[in-house]
From Swiss-Prot:
Binding positions (substrate): 27-31, 77, 154, 209, 327
Family per similarity comment: Belongs to the uroporphyrinogen decarboxylase family.
Site positions (Transition state stabilizer): 77
Signal peptide: none
Protein name listed in UniProt: Uroporphyrinogen decarboxylase
């Protein structure tokens, strides 16, 4: 594989000095880009897009052609793993992802098994390999998965939920069943991410999108414990290079110190926590990724730039910061505002370093 021309993102994750703050965006290949919408139309469906290595590669590269981003992220979906477990993923118009066979009885749960990433999920590995070849060493490629808890939410609820009634009922009435789901799912996530690393992913991220809906004791028992299990099982080095890991719990700022202790290289922050305070708490242990409110991208360009500078100023000219949004970019984002954001992050972070001689 080609040597990286821009490894700023990887160095930042390892808290090494960088010339500027690297930036990429969660969901950077998505519906806010007209070229993505055109490719999605050609694919016929979102799942077809995910399951075609050539089309997944095409949309992964689209934001990199527009913006000076410092990393690419595999185009896929967090629900590929439970789909490979046989739950039957489909997308209902106006409802988002659904499962034909959600986990509702003990027999189904006890028979849950880890899918082979080189069988049911080989299309993902083929996409990773194809994207790495297409990037030709320009920037690193991030692989990803949902967290065990977040995947379990979809697997038990059958789709998105407002109150998580089914899975929370299980957590408090039959925790043994939920722990079984989480254990199998954690092992599946480890195998899935390691297969992505072997296929060419140079960093990996675990999205714990729904960890923040839990009470503290429940978060530690049903989410954090299994995030730890995933991190412990990851491949740490590949092709002679460290493969950094990022863990992101949306709504997890109140547990930041505990999350930082599980062994990942970086912790993602949503927009509700001051990143300067976060650095003061855990900056000696982990890099931090974040944490602009995605809604700021609806504002005029000068407001976008001002808020980006505010986040950078809060973190300061220290190593270990990867700039990102606090959650995925909205489909309604004006594409030109992303240009403003990326350019501001690069320019202002260089000025911050120059001011201290860094």
């Amino acid at each position: 594989m080609s040597r990286l021309k821009n490894d700023t993102f990887l160095r930042a994750l390892l808290r090494q000095p960088t010339e500027y703050t690297p930036v990429w965006l969660m969901r950077q290949a998505g519906r806010y880009l007209p070229e993505y919408c055109e490719t999605r139309k050609r694919a016929g469906s979102f799942l077809n897009l995910c399951k075609s290595p050539a089309l997944a590669c095409e949309v992964t590269l689209q934001p990199l052609a527009r913006y000076d981003l410092d990393a690419a992220i595999l185009f896929s979906d967090i629900l590929t793993v439970p789909d490979a477990m046989g739950l039957g993923l489909y997308f209902a118009e106006g409802e988002g992802p659904r499962f034909e066979r959600p986990l509702r009885d003990e027999w189904e749960i006890r028979n849950l098994s880890v899918p082979d990433p080189h069988a049911e999920l080989q299309y993902v590995m083929d996409a990773v390999s194809e994207i790495r070849r297409a990037l030709d060493g320009s920037v690193p490629l991030i692989g990803f998965s949902g967290s065990p808890w977040t995947l379990a939410c979809y697997m038990v609820e059958g789709g998105s939920s407002d109150d998580y009634r089914r899975i929370k009922t299980m957590a408090y009435s039959r925790p043994d069943l939920l722990h079984h789901i989480l254990g199998v799912t954690a092992d599946a996530v480890v195998q899935y991410l390691n297969a992505q690393i072997e296929a060419g992913a140079q960093a990996v991220m675990v999205f714990d999108s729904w960890g923040g809906v839990l009470a503290e004791a429940a978060y530690r028992e049903f989410s954090l414990r299994y995030l730890q299990r995933v991190v412990d099982g990851l491949i740490r080095e590949r092709e002679g290079q460290r493969v950094p890991s990022i863990v992101f719990t949306k709504g997890g700022g109140i547990w930041l110190e505990s999350i930082a202790a599980i062994g990942s290289d970086a912790v993602g922050l949503d927009w509700t926590m001051d990143i300067g305070r976060a650095r003061a708490l855990v900056g000696q242990r982990v890099a931090l990724q974040g944490n602009l409110d995605p809604s700021i991208l609806f504002a005029p360009p000068e407001a976008v730039a001002a808020e980006a500078r505010r986040v950078l100023d809060a973190y300061g000219p220290h190593p270990g910061h990867v700039f990102n949004l606090g959650h995925g970019i909205s489909q309604f984002t004006p594409p030109e505002n992303v240009s403003v954001l990326v350019d501001t992050v690069h320019d202002h972070s260089r000025k911050l370093r120059a001011a201290v001689g860094g």
